[in-house]
Curated annotation (Swiss-Prot):
Catalytic activity: S-ubiquitinyl-[E2 ubiquitin-conjugating enzyme]-L-cysteine + [acceptor protein]-L-lysine = [E2 ubiquitin-conjugating enzyme]-L-cysteine + N(6)-ubiquitinyl-[acceptor protein]-L-lysine
The protein's annotated pathway: Protein modification; protein ubiquitination
Disulfide partners: none
Subunit structure: Interacts with RAP2-2. Interacts with SINAT6. Interacts with ATG6 and TRAF1A. Interacts with WAV3. Interacts with FREE1. Interacts with ELC/VPS23A.
Task performed by this protein: E3 ubiquitin-protein ligase that mediates ubiquitination and subsequent proteasomal degradation of target proteins. E3 ubiquitin ligases accept ubiquitin from an E2 ubiquitin-conjugating enzyme in the form of a thioester and then directly transfers the ubiquitin to targeted substrates. It probably triggers the ubiquitin-mediated degradation of different substrates. Mediates the proteasomal-dependent degradation of ATG6, a component of the autophagosome complex. Requires TRAF1A/MUSE14 and TRAF1B/MUSE13 to target ATG6 for ubiquitination and subsequent regulation of autophagosome assembly.
Family: Belongs to the SINA (Seven in absentia) family.
CC per GO annotation: autophagosome; multivesicular body
Residues the record lists as binding Zn(2+) 1: C118, C125, H137, C141
Entry's transmembrane regions: none
Protein's name according to its UniProt entry: E3 ubiquitin-protein ligase SINAT2
Length: 308
């Protein structure tokens, strides 16, 4: 959400009624600590399923993650990772001795000989890596969990796509629609007073995949603008298989945007700041709205298609 903005309820106008509705503020309480589902995003600490005691030796007793150099030890041989050494204020959490700066070089050397699976193996990654290459791979693994794409508030929930779809529907109360075309009217009674705002996103089920439609108001330099854009619930390589168009207009004039939906791997803010979408200056948006230009009534139409 843009700094200082508010989450606004998007209004979708039915072609059969021709009625406009005022945008409502979305007040949704979200449990950001909601556990992920087993077998989807609920996974083990580091994806190692082995009875080998070496792996247990490499587990930090404080954070329970695998340890990477420098691995520290106290005079009695108890080990812990470098991050936790700072957290425990240089005191061994096992025996309470002062840690000092003793490295456990033997354990670091043993780790070099190990091959371990990706921590996301139960999400589909079955590759095996040298111990010290595993962490770098996991930062970019295509099977790693996605972050919730909701833009109306900060949400820390992660998971696979099916888990996030349920989360968006149940926890954020996001509207879900089937189809590859859309026709929305965004309404706001006091657009001149709203410099930063994020409307409630809508999720479309299209070609068996999910797409998030965003709409918001923010300042582009000194100019107030509105922006609409689409994000794909999947990886960037999959997103490139699709294209979409957005259009606004009235009085014989129109603005059209065509592009490729961005993956939700890219944050909402990153996409907005890159201006990768349909940008409508506020004066033009109010012109398209008609009337005395004191109320936003902006119709955004669009469609999604699959590239052959």
């Amino acid at each position: 959400m843009a700094p200082g903005g508010s989450a606004l309820k998007e209004v979708m106008e039915s072609n059969s009624t021709g009625m406009d509705y005022e945008v409502k503020t979305a007040k949704v309480e979200v449990n950001n600590n909601k556990p992920t589902k087993p077998g989807s995003a609920g996974i083990g600490k580091y994806g190692i399923h082995s009875n080998n005691g070496v792996y247990e030796l490499l587990e930090c007793p404080v954070c329970t993650n695998l340890m990477y150099p420098p691995i520290h030890q106290c005079p009695n041989g108890h080990t812990l990772c470098s991050n936790c050494k700072l957290r425990v204020q240089n005191t061994c959490p096992t025996c309470r001795y002062e840690l000092g700066n003793i490295r456990c070089l033997a354990l670091e050397k043993v780790a070099e000989s190990l091959e371990v699976p990706c921590r996301y193996q139960n999400l589909g990654c079955h590759d095996i890596f040298p111990y010290y290459s595993k962490l770098k791979h996991e930062q970019h693994c295509r099977f790693r969990p996605y972050t919730c794409p909701y833009a109306g508030s900060e949400c820390s929930v992660t998971g696979d796509i099916p888990t996030l779809v349920v989360h968006l529907k149940d926890d954020h109360k996001v509207d879900m629609h089937d189809g590859c075309t859309f026709n929305h009217r965004y309404v706001k009674s006091n657009p001149h007073e709203v410099e930063n705002a994020t409307w409630m996103l809508t999720v479309f089920n299209c070609f068996g995949r999910q797409f998030c439609l965003h709409f918001e108001a923010f300042q582009l330099g000194m100019a107030p603008v509105y922006m609409a854009f689409l994000r794909f619930m999947g990886d960037e390589n999959e997103a490139k298989k699709f294209s979409y168009s957005l259009e606004v207009g009235a009085h014989g004039r129109k603005l059209t945007w065509q592009g490729i939906p961005r993956s939700i791997r890219d944050s909402h803010r990153k996409v907005r700041d890159s201006q990768d979408g349909l940008i409508i200056p506020r004066n033009l948006a109010l012109y398209f709205s008609g009337g005395d230009r004191q109320e936003l009534k902006l119709r955004v139409t669009g469609r999604i298609w699959k590239e052959e």
